[in-house]
């Protein structure tokens, strides 16, 4: 999910330059502390970090497949480590995930032709992200039941720029912050429900925050 914030600065009609307000200084300082959006490689893994610029979020790559993220009063961000391109592999991860409000820990990725954004949600905060979509069915995998949903995003940010696209969701009923995800099971279940993926782009174990605060430390393998 993506939200955007706007900033309106009032100017005084005087001949001398007005001193910046305490609010504008604080907002500029907050922006300077936050990690900018970026992609690349770190520790032998692909990483992706995206933020809409709202609030304070610090994403830090560690050794190997590890990373940390701390966020305060954010708009929306998503970041993590994995692979580019993704595949129908089994992904192991471990760590801590402590959202205060709305946040997700998931296997997260994109495909093209068709353009699909997908989530295999392992844990979430106080909001189940799948419930905003349409429930399609369930899947038994990796020791739990996953509820499967679809949703449509219109004129939203994507790997192809602003676009309209479909989201696929598998949301684990028993939350966890470590384990293995057999992605093939999800891809097969989606296909059986008529949910067709395209050609894999990147695939990461991601932390996402939306209008919330929190912290996480994750290692991917």
Swiss-Prot record:
GO terms classed as biological process: xylan catabolic process
Coiled coil (UniProt feature): none
Protein name: Endo-1,4-beta-xylanase B
Family annotation (Pfam families): Glyco_hydro_11
Function according to Swiss-Prot or TrEMBL: Endo-1,4-beta-xylanase involved in the hydrolysis of xylan, a major structural heterogeneous polysaccharide found in plant biomass representing the second most abundant polysaccharide in the biosphere, after cellulose.
EC number from the UniProt entry: 3.2.1.8
Family: Belongs to the glycosyl hydrolase 11 (cellulase G) family.
Gene3D superfamilies registered for this protein in UniProt: 2.60.120.180
Active-site residues, record numbering mapped to chain: 117 (nucleophile), 208 (proton donor)
Upregulating conditions: Expressed in the presence of D-xylose under conditions of acidic ambient pH, probably under the regulation of the pacC transcription factor. Repressed in presence of glucose through the action of the creA transcription repressor.
One function term, GO molecular function aspect: endo-1,4-beta-xylanase activity
Signal peptide annotation: 1-18
Pathway in which the depicted protein is active: Glycan degradation; xylan degradation
GO CC, one annotated term: extracellular region
Location of the GH11 domain: 33-221
Keywords: Carbohydrate metabolism, Glycosidase, Hydrolase, Polysaccharide degradation, Secreted, Signal, Xylan degradation
SUPFAM superfamilies given in the database record: Concanavalin A-like lectins/glucanases
InterPro entries for the chain: ConA-like_dom_sf, GH11/12, GH11_AS_1, GH11_AS_2, GH11_dom, Glyco_hydro_11
Catalytic activity, reaction form: Endohydrolysis of (1->4)-beta-D-xylosidic linkages in xylans
UniProt subcellular location: Secreted
